[in-house]
């Protein structure tokens, strides 16, 4: 479990996270939702150690991540998989080389052992035949799946996904959602996903946290979202649904 306890984050004089307290459940898909500027990406990056916080604590099980020095944090970083917005693949590297990067950085495995693990992960995301292709030769959905293969190559305990469906068509987004959900349960990972897509929430969300203006406004299950009386949450759900309808093809 990952426990966030009363964290605060400022950029200059602007407070972007205010007294956030939430537990993210082990072995489940935990979704952070909110409008642009609500603080969800900052929160995700703070949990992953990519942003320092100004106060509060972040616990990985019983370990206070915020109290560790950089060297001590490496042990936890090795247990993290990250899927960045846009997949963030290296253009100069093949799909296989992109997936292998964490193994090159964190392990002293032989090249044959690394490639065996890489090929296993590419096959797991149904891309076993594209290892020698470059990102420019792949569709957006295929790039996202390469990113997912890279995220799981270290057999992580924690998976962080920043807007995994950004830029994808609805059908491809469904495929990515299902794949992330399957891998979460297969690897028993604590998965945290940032999204503004209510389709993703209703499809795979097991715990949902709603941020509003840098604060935790609401948390619960996807089944209770539509029963909530929280005005900010209801406004967000309505706006998300309107945006979805406007994107649908007109006949």
Residue ranges of predicted features:
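Helix-to-loop junction immediately C-terminal to a conserved catalytic motif
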Residues: 48
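Conserved ABC transporter NBD signature motif
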Residues: 56-64
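Conserved ABC ATPase "signature" region
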Residues: 111-129
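Conserved ABC ATPase signature
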Residues: 134-138, 142
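A short, proline-enriched helix->beta-strand linker immediately N-terminal to the Walker B motif
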Residues: 153-157
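Catalytic Walker B motif of ABC-type/P-loop ATPase nucleotide-binding domains
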Residues: 159-162
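Helix N-cap at the start of a conserved alpha-helix in ABC-type nucleotide-binding domains
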Residues: 170-172
């Amino acid at each position: 479990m990952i426990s966030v306890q009363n964290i605060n984050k400022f950029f200059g004089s602007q407070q972007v996270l205010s007294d956030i307290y939430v537990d993210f459940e082990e072995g489940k898909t935990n979704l952070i939702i909110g409008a642009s500027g609500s603080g969800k990406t900052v929160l995700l990056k703070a949990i992953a150690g990519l942003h320092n916080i100004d106060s509060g604590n972040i616990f990985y099980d019983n370990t206070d991540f915020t109290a560790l020095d950089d060297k001590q944090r490496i042990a936890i970083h090795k247990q993290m998989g990250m899927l960045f917005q846009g997949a963030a693949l290296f253009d100069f590297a093949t799909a296989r080389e992109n997936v292998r990067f964490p193994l090159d950085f964190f392990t002293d495995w032989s090249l044959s052992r690394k490639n065996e693990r890489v090929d296993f992960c590419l096959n797991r995301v149904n891309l076993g035949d594209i290892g020698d292709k470059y990102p420019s030769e792949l569709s957006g959905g295929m790039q996202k799946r390469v990113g997912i293969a890279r995220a799981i190559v270290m057999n992580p305990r924690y998976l962080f996904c920043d807007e995994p469906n950004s830029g994808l068509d609805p059908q491809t987004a469904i495929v990515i959602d299902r794949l992330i959900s399957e891998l979460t349960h297969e690897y028993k990972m604590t998965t945290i996903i940032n999204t503004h897509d209510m389709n993703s929430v209703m499809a795979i969300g097991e715990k949902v946290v709603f941020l509003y203006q840098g604060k935790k406004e609401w948390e619960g299950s996807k089944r209770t979202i539509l029963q909530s009386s929280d005005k900010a949450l209801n406004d967000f759900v309505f706006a998300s649904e309107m945006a979805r309808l406007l994107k649908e093809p007109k006949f």
